[in-house]
Structures are given as C-alpha cells and as structure tokens.
UniProtKB/Swiss-Prot annotation:
The lineage of its organism: Bacteria, Pseudomonadati, Pseudomonadota, Gammaproteobacteria, Alteromonadales. It comes from Alteromonas mediterranea (strain DSM 17117 / CIP 110805 / LMG 28347 / Deep ecotype). Its cofactor is Mg(2+). One of its GO terms (molecular function) is fructose 1,6-bisphosphate 1-phosphatase activity. Pathway: Carbohydrate biosynthesis; gluconeogenesis. This is Fructose-1,6-bisphosphatase class 1.
C-alpha cells in the first residue's frame, strides 16, 4: 500500500506543506493513543470550564487542543492557529508560511460512550503582511484552503485528506506508525437513500427543511416514492466519513432559535474542511443559500448552516428552498 508521503508527492504538494501535514498528524496519533486509554488514564469526563462557544469542555477537548497547539507551535511551519477551544488566534512562528484551523476533538461528548470522535483541520497560506496574532488573516473563503482533512478515532484510526487533487482515505498502521492509503480517490455516489440530521430540532427549522425531511420520512408512500434510512452519530466527523464511504446527505440546517447563531457548525474548522473533502470526492456542500466554500468569514468562530453530501440529494434538498420562494 502507498504511504502518505508518496501520495502527497504525487498530488504535487510542496515539501513544506507535506512536512506540516506530517507534523499535524504526529499530534493526531498522540490524541488517538490518549483516546484509546479512556478511563484507564482518567481522561474521560468534563472540566469545570467552558470554551468560547459556551460549551462545557471535556477533559479530552483540553488535552487534544494542547497536543495540537504545542506540536504546531514548535514546527516552524505555522504562523498562527485558530482552534474551537481558543478564544483568540494563537501566534506561532513569525516566519511560518501557513495558518491552521482545527476542531481538536469533534464529538467529544461521545467519549463517555466509546463512540466515534475525530479531529478536523484546514490549512491556508499565511499572508506575508500578517502579524502572528492578527485574526483578520484567517478571514479567507474556503476556496483558499491548500489542504483539509479529518482524523477519525474509531475501531481503526483513519485519515481523510485532500490537497485539491481528490480525496483519499488512509488507515493508521499502528505497528509501524504510518498512514497507508486504503481508499484512493473516493467518489461519493450521486444518489442516496440515507440522511443524517438531528430530528429533535425539527420545530426550529425553516418550513422548506421541515417539508423536505417530512417527505424523506414518508418513504415509499410519500412523494419521493422510496424508503430512506436516518443515521446520526452526533459527531460530524463520523457522519461525513459514512457519506464519503457510501453516500448520503448530512444536514445541520438554519435554526431560528438564536439569530446570532444561524447554524451550529463553525465555518473555518468544521464546515470548510468537510466541504473541501466532499467537493473533491464529487459531492456538494451548501449553506442553503450558497456554496460553503464561497462564504467570506466575518470572525474566526463564525457558524453556518450545512447541507453536505451526494450531489443529486443536496440539489433535491435545495429545490425545496426554491419552491418556497
């Protein structure tokens, strides 16, 4: 099987980007080990603190954030970091050429039940003019990413990665410590009969989304004329991994409970990297009003609605918005 380095070289990734990705993945391998220790190492449960999102931090949130932050700050390749667990950007090397945004442990509430969790990341070029503590440099649309991916900590530790030349999935060989290419050039099926959404929030959605989900649930007896299955992992990284492997549609739609938070998922380190992966695999990624990768961020923790997955099903979902106008 091909090693990560060989595939990155084949895809034309520059040397410094390859070295940065390897450095980031060294941190992810340490997170994978910490996660695997669980209660044996006393890393489960919550802390007494909240992050900038107002969410109670799990112990593994904090541990994972420190691992990635320390690893990247010492690398020499990164000018600054933005993280879900940090209020502000974290300055690194003034000579660094890249900016890294990450959710250190997506789905951390799943640690208590030994379910799927993962690390999501995106990488962009650092403007030469920026100071390492300047958050404005992160306010670039997702089209400017040079790499994005996630590491899934499940029965095996897997990496989904794109540098703009297709989406590849690698599996960590824990015997030798390297990521091996196991699923090259993933292509998401254009059609699907599976959907992922937290249906308990249905009353807070726009009427068009409520109508779309109602038609899916109506199955063969409804206007779609076929049965659909609902899958929900409660971790974006797990749901998107399933979509990449066998198709589907993932939705965290506009929610009218809080106008200041029109979506739940953060643009820079959740929506953008997943959108990049999905588009490079032949899928589609939208907010409901436009392409996720074209959203111009206004602040580093900005949230957006997400409709991601098999192209034809995403288009079908969006058509309900068009019909509601």
């Amino acid at each position: 099987m091909k090693r990560l380095n060989s595939q990155l070289q084949q895809d034309g990734a520059p040397l410094e980007l390859i070295l940065l990705i390897r450095t980031l993945l060294a941190g992810c391998k340490e997170i994978s080990f910490r996660v695997s220790q669980g209660a044996l190492a006393g890393v489960l449960g919550s802390t007494l603190s909240e992050n900038v999102q107002g969410e109670t931090q799990k112990k593994l949130d904090v541990i994972s954030n420190h691992i990635l932050k320390d690893t990247l700050r010492e690398s020499g390749y990164v000018k600054a970091i933005s993280s879900e667990e940090e209020d502000d950007v974290v300055p690194c090397d003034p000579e660094g050429k890249y900016l890294v945004s990450f959710d250190p442990l997506d789905g951390s509430s799943n640690t208590e039940i030994n379910s799927l969790i993962g690390t999501i990341f995106s990488i962009t070029h650092a403007p030469q003019w920026m100071k390492p503590d300047d958050p404005s440099a992160f306010l670039q649309p997702g089209t400017q990413m040079v790499a994005a991916g996630y590491v899934l900590y499940g029965p095996s530790t897997m990496l989904a990665l794109t540098t703009g030349r297709g989406t590849h999935i690698y599996t960590l060989d824990k015997t030798h410590g390297g990521f091996l290419l196991t699923h090259p050039n993933i292509q998401v099926p254009e059609q699907t009969s599976e959907f992922s959404i937290n249906a308990s929030n249905q009353r807070h959605w726009e009427p068009a989304m409520q109508a779309y989900i109602a038609d899916l649930l109506a199955g063969k007896d409804g206007p779609r004329g076929k049965n659909f299955n609902m899958r929900w992992v409660a971790a974006m990284v797990g749901d998107i991994h399933r979509l990449l492997c066998r198709g589907g549609i993932f939705m965290y739609p506009f929610d009218n409970r809080d106008p200041s938070k029109p979506g739940k998922l953060r643009l820079l380190y959740e929506a953008n990297p997943m959108a990049f992966l999905m588009e490079q695999a032949g899928g589609k990624a939208e907010t409901g009003t436009g392409r996720i990768l074209e959203v111009m961020p206004e602040e580093i923790h900005q949230r957006v609605p997400c409709i991601i997955g098999s192209k034809e099903e995403v288009d079908m979902c969006l058509s309900y918005n068009d019909n509601a106008k």
